[in-house]
Each structure stands twice: as C-alpha cells, then as structure tokens.
Amino acid sequence: MIKLKQLIAATLLLSTAFGVHAERLKDIASISGVRANQLIGYGLVVGLNGTGDQTTQTPFTLQTFNNMLSQFGIKVPSGSGTVQLKNVAAVAVYADLPAFAKPGQTVDITVSSIGNSKSLRGGALLMTPMKGVDGNVYAIAQGNLVVGGFDAEGRDGSKITVNVPSSGRIPGGASVERSVPSGFNQGNTLTLNLNRSDFTTAKRIVDKINELLGPGVAQALDGGSVRVTAPLDPGQRVDYLSILENLEVDPGQTAAKVIINSRTGTIVIGQNVKVSPAAVTHGSLTVTITEDPIVSQPGALSGGQTAVVPRSRVNAQQELHPMFKFGPGTTLDEIVRAVNQVGAAPGDLMAILEALKQAGALQADLIVI
C-alpha cells in the first residue's frame, strides 16, 4: 500500500482533474458508527416572573420540587396546604452528544416546558442529569436560558405572543461526563454509508478509492455502503480517513421525481423529469349560489300573513384554457413555460401532473406528501 505521505500528494493531483459537479466524499457519505447520540433529561426551571406551572394542574411539578428540597434536608410540612409555585416550571431537556465527545467538553441543549408554563423567559435550569437510551448519565445540564419568544397579556384579556416562549436553549449548557464507546478503531475495515443510496455513486466511490490506493481496497456492499480497508494504528487511521473524505466524486444523477405537497400547494419538479408526447387542456368550473330572500305581502283583506320566501340564484361559469402540447422528451423548463402560459394555479398544475402520470406520459415518480 502506498505510504500516507505519498497519498496526500497523489490526492492533490487527482482532485484537480474532476468536473465542476464533483462533491467531496465527506459531503455524500458518513462513516458507519460515527454519529451523534440523543440525550434527554427532566428538570426544573426556576426564577420565572410568575409564568411558571400552575401546580394545581401540574402536580408533578410540585412533586419534583419537594423531592429536590428533600435532598437538601428540607421537608415541606404535610399540613401546610397546597403550595402554589408561580416561578417554577417542569421541563424536558434534550441534546445531541457528538461523536468522540470527551468528558469536560460542553454541548448545546434545548429546554422545553412540559407543563402549562406560559413562558420560560428569564429562567434558569437547575442541575439536570441527561441520559442516553441505555439509561446511563452522559452529561449534566445547568444554566440560564436564552428564550427568543415572549408573550404579554392585558387586564382585558388581550394577549400577544411572539415566537415560542415556552422553549429555549442554553449554549454550552451541558457538560459531558462520560464518553460513548465507539468501534472506530476496531478491525481492519471501515464502512462508508451513502447519505442517499445510489448504485452509480457507490461504484464511482469504489473506482476513485481503488484508483488512488490500489485494486481491492474498496468494495461496494450494496447501493448504500462501501467497505474500505483501513490501517490498524489509530493515528494512521485518522490520516487515512482525512485523505478519503476529501476525495471528490461525481455522484450519480437522482431519479426523476415530482414532489407535491397537497396541504401547502408546493410542487417541486426534479431536473431529470421529462414528458412523453401528450396534449393537455385544463379548465375550471365555478358554481356560485346566492341567497336573495324576498318578502311576500298578501293583499288587503285577504286574511293572509306576511312571509319570507327564499330565493336562490345559481350561476355556473367555466374558464376555458387553450390546449397545449408536449413533444417527445419535453424538459422541466418547457413544462413550466407551457403551464405558466395558460395561467395555471398550483392546484391546477397538480391536477395536470396527476393526469399526465395516469396517462403514462410523465416519466417520473409522482410523490404526494
């Protein structure tokens, strides 16, 4: 195998030969097992300006508060009645523990109210252990919250709320107490997982690594992962991966897709979408019903009674749009231009795309989310 120092020079020479669409390997793939881990905890935020939990409706807040006091040797008398706390809120604390995080390092945390607190603005999180999915404590969180939202309420009941005042963040608010075991330095191979599975991209990664390091160093396991041989020494392994992750690879083109969000009317058409020969016309029918009741007045001395008689007016109006034709291999630009010429709204475009798909003329996957 070529020495690492020679690999660095070879990498610099090869990287200049790639096209403008090449992407770094670190941007399209990740190393198996090297990932962040989620942490979660439960704690109390104190120091709120009367915007804390209503303990009569959230008894767990009062229970947590009493448990905290008991740890300091303070016991609330049972006959003291219901304690009302207005400046305390029960919160959920969560964070992502980065890969290779070491004890003593800090991570950002997010704090969210789980009771009926109106706002966490101005509050401070008390010491909260943060656990992983295995139940072990990996970090301790504490600090003053940064809340971007606020709310205000007048005596007449008028209220204004900006952003979300019931959630905030503490930059560097958790101190790492335990490292997560990693299999990074185990074995003589590493697996690269593609962010988006694609057989073409996987093959190009294998070809590029083998071109640089020699035949058989990289092997594609499937369309989403590539296994590479790696040095056993931890220091050499770091140097080795620093070379691999900066290799530039031309990723394969994505499959042709049309994404439709029926709730928001958003339509995203991929670059490779094409349409077979087809003729399309689309019109909309608008039906308007107007209620115009009239008063029926009986004649004099007829003995009748005045009555309100309903009268409805129904009007139907249909908008006619000209027919437009798609030729063979029509591209995205031509589709958009043709639809814009007839003034189709997003809802109309959805109907047109669905009809083209049903007719077999849309050469793409139609995905409705």
Curated annotation (Swiss-Prot):
Keywords: Bacterial flagellum, Periplasm, Signal. Residues 1-22 form the signal peptide. GO terms for molecular function: structural molecule activity. One of its GO terms (biological process) is bacterial-type flagellum-dependent cell motility. Pfam families: FlgI. The keyword Phosphoprotein does not apply. It is found in: Periplasm; Bacterial flagellum basal body. GO terms for cellular component: bacterial-type flagellum basal body, distal rod, P ring; outer membrane-bounded periplasmic space. It comes from the Bacteria. The basal body constitutes a major portion of the flagellar organelle and consists of four rings (L,P,S, and M) mounted on a central rod. Belongs to the FlgI family. This is Flagellar P-ring protein. It comes from Pseudomonas savastanoi pv. phaseolicola (strain 1448A / Race 6) (Pseudomonas syringae pv. phaseolicola (strain 1448A / Race 6)). The gene is flgI.
